[in-house]
Amino acid sequence: MNKHPKDAPLVGAIEAGGTKFVCAVGTCPQDLVRTEFPSGDNPAQVLAEVTNWLKEQQHQRGMLQAIGVASFGPLDLHPDSPTYGFITSTPKPGWKNTNILGAVKRAFPDIPTAFDTDVNGAALGEFCWGHGAGLRDFVYVTIGTGIGGGVMVGGRLLHGLVHSEMGHLLLPRLPGDTFAGVCPFHGACWEGLCSGPALLARAGMPAEDIPPGHEAWTREIQYIAYAVANLVCVLSPQRVIIGGSVRKAGQLGQDRFFRMIREQVRTALNDYLVSPALQEEIDSFVVPPLLGDEAGICGAIALAQLLAQQKIV
């Protein structure tokens, strides 16, 4: 994939998140014009705002060669399905059964459009320009409004039957933890226990306000470690990248947050799997995204770039 503005085609990108839509036009992470719109509960309105902005940028900068859409889900990613391009059974108010891809295609009928999950997009962004570069097998997890994950296997994104929904893994409960969880589908799944809304419900305050010694952080980190250990056992990744707003960990701090997760992952695995990556090199095994908060929109750029260049990941 071309990684420099002089080599890469001009593309549009949409990162459709549960809280906000991030839109960009450019050629690579160093060459982006971007804006944001609140997701709200009126899909028609926000999609009109998004597509109108992309049209304005196209008028100013020239014809877009492709558009990449990386969206929250669940999604229908099967091109032969009558609901291909739809957000399907999301708990987000107003967005169930929204034809997000169709809205983009109607606005840009002559421009090819790539479509995938937001977390697959972020994984692809890290694969092209971040901590997944040079790796063929890794996992990207985001912990924010919800929890989701993208998986790279053999240098290609994993899709399979539907797409990964690792945020709904069912985890062993910690002794004495009676928190019911906030997931409307599963209650105390990983997302129900560890998402931003879960931290708010458990601690009575948002993540950025929770003091470092609060029990909510102890449980949060232990459950994340359980989930990472499960991913290691099932997928055998070369690296686990954890993004999303919760990983900043407020007053606890991102460095301490990751250090504690790594310690608990080692404890959970209990030296069953033998690899330097899981022992002395674990500091480079469980890491935050190199692209930071831009992983998702950079992934949408990468989706569009690959389509424009007729490459498949």
Where are these regions (language model features)?
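Charge-lined substrate channels and their catalytic hotspots, especially those that engage the 3′ end
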Residues: 158
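ATP-binding/phosphotransfer module of carbohydrate and carboxylate kinases, centering on a glycine-rich
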Residues: 1-66, 75-83, 102-113, 125-135, ...
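Short beta-strand segments
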Residues: 15, 68-72, 116, 140-146, ...
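Short clusters of small/polar residues that mark proteolytic maturation junctions
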Residues: 36-37, 92, 162
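A charged helix-plus-loop insertion that forms the helical arch/lid used to bind
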Residues: 81-97
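A short, polar/charged loop-to-alpha-helix boundary motif
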Residues: 162-176
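Adenylate-forming
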Residues: 121-128, 149-151, 170
